[in-house]
Each structure stands twice: as structure tokens, then as C-alpha cells.
């Protein structure tokens, strides 16, 4: 993998945020191709994915894809999951309150909710927003500051991009509590693939941030 150090930094955050999932019922919302899940024991992870093509890859990697579609339109068993997480998928949700509300209903009492994503206010977030507005990464303002392998332009353009505070407010309004925050990719984007970064507490500096809350 050409951007392996960046991926390993994100994987460390993913593993830190999820913690020990052995014996737990876990749901990945917007599981994509299951790339992150393929790096851990994902035998107990269920998934929801809008794309049939991506979901098929995730299934081959061991994720039990239970539904194809958006979380907002999915009927889930209530009080059923020990943990529900969104790894990168909240940036494609227009209505966070609606999406997070579906997750809350499906969580067991005191169940764990995790959202990992690029914050709108981060350096990566600003870069993606500019690329979205310009319709290209070849904008003069981005010359000399881009990472070697940026996020695919079509995904930047499809993203809604929310701030961390916006997500926190939506979760608090739904009654989630006992928050924890972790972050990585503290370097500027063009340097993030030079080394694997450690996970540190907080959310105000990282280019990839994990929000952990409980029902």
C-alpha cells in the first residue's frame, strides 16, 4: 500500500476506539469494502453498506453485511448491539440526528457508539472542501501542499463534511453521555505518510478523530 504509514495511523485510531470487541455484537454503519475490518478479527462484525459492490468486497473480507442501504432507511433490531461504529461514513450523512438516532435505538443500554472521521475544521477537511468547490485537486492554492495520494476526488465531492462539535451536539441532543475523544494525523497533510503517528487524546488537532459515547 503506497500510503501505508497514513493508513497505519488511521488503523491505530480505529483499534483504540473500538477496543476489545471479542464476544460482542458489533455493527459497522457504512462498512465500505471492509478494509479496516480485514486488519482485525471481524468475525463478529455486522455491516450496513449503501454500495452493493463495496459490500460484496466487505463480505469477502469477513464482514457479515446484513443490509444494503442508508442507515436512516434501515430497520434494525432495538437494544441489540453492544457497539455501533461509523468509520468515515458520517461525512456522507446529511442529517446526523436522524442517523445517530437510528443507531441509538439499536444499541443496548449503555451501549458504545463510535464515530471516526475527518473533521470539517481540520487541515484535511479544509483541503477536501476546497477540492470539492474547485472540482479538482489541481487548484493553484493546493500546489505544493497536497499529500502524495489524496482522497479520491469523487468522494470529496460527495461528502457533506461535519465538524466535530456538530457531531458532539447531535449526540448530546439524543441523550448520549460519557464521551471520550482520540485523534491522529496531527501532521499537515503533505507529511502524514512519512511516519506512523501515535493516537493521542482529544479532538482539536487531528486530521482523523474518534468520538466515543454511550447510550
Task: Write out the residue ranges for each language-model feature.
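A short acidic, Gly/Pro-enriched loop at the edge of an enzyme's catalytic core
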Residues: 72-84
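Core SAM-dependent methyltransferase catalytic element
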Residues: 174, 194-215
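Conserved class I S-adenosyl-L-methionine
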Residues: 1-22, 35-39, 54-57, 114-144, 185, ...
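A short SAM/SAH-binding and catalytic strip from SAM-dependent methyltransferases
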Residues: 83-96
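Class I SAM-dependent methyltransferase SAM/SAH-binding core
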Residues: 27-28, 32-73
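Short alpha-helix
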Residues: 158-181
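A short glycine-rich, Lys/Arg-flanked "PGG" loop and its adjoining helix->strand segment in the class I
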Residues: 97-112
Amino acid at each position: 500500500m503506497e500510503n501505508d504509514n497514513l493508513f497505519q495511523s488511521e488503523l491505530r485510531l480505529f483499534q483504540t476506539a473500538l477496543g476489545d470487541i471479542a464476544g460482542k455484537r458489533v455493527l459497522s454503519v457504512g462498512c465500505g469494502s471492509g478494509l479496516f475490518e480485514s486488519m482485525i478479527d471481524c468475525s463478529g462484525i455486522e455491516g450496513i453498506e449503501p454500495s452493493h459492490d463495496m459490500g460484496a468486497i466487505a463480505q469477502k473480507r469477513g464482514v457479515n453485511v446484513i443490509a444494503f442501504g442508508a442507515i436512516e432507511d434501515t430497520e434494525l433490531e432495538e437494544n441489540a448491539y453492544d457497539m455501533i461504529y461509523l468509520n468515515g461514513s458520517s461525512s456522507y450523512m446529511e442529517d446526523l440526528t436522524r442517523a445517530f438516532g437510528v443507531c441509538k435505538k439499536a444499541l443496548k443500554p449503555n451501549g458504545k457508539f463510535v464515530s471516526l472521521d475527518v473533521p470539517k475544521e481540520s487541515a484535511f477537511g479544509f483541503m477536501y472542501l476546497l477540492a470539492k468547490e474547485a472540482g479538482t485537486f489541481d487548484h493553484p492554492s493546493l500546489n505544493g501542499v497536497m499529500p502524495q495520494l489524496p482522497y479520491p476526488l469523487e468522494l470529496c465531492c460527495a461528502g457533506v463534511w461535519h465538524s466535530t462539535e456538530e457531531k458532539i451536539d447531535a449526540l448530546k441532543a439524543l441523550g448520549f453521555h460519557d464521551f471520550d475523544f482520540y485523534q491522529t494525523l496531527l501532521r499537515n497533510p503533505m507529511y502524514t505518510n512519512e511516519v506512523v503517528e501515535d493516537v493521542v487524546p482529544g479532538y482539536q488537532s487531528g486530521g482523523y478523530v474518534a468520538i466515543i459515547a454511550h447510550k
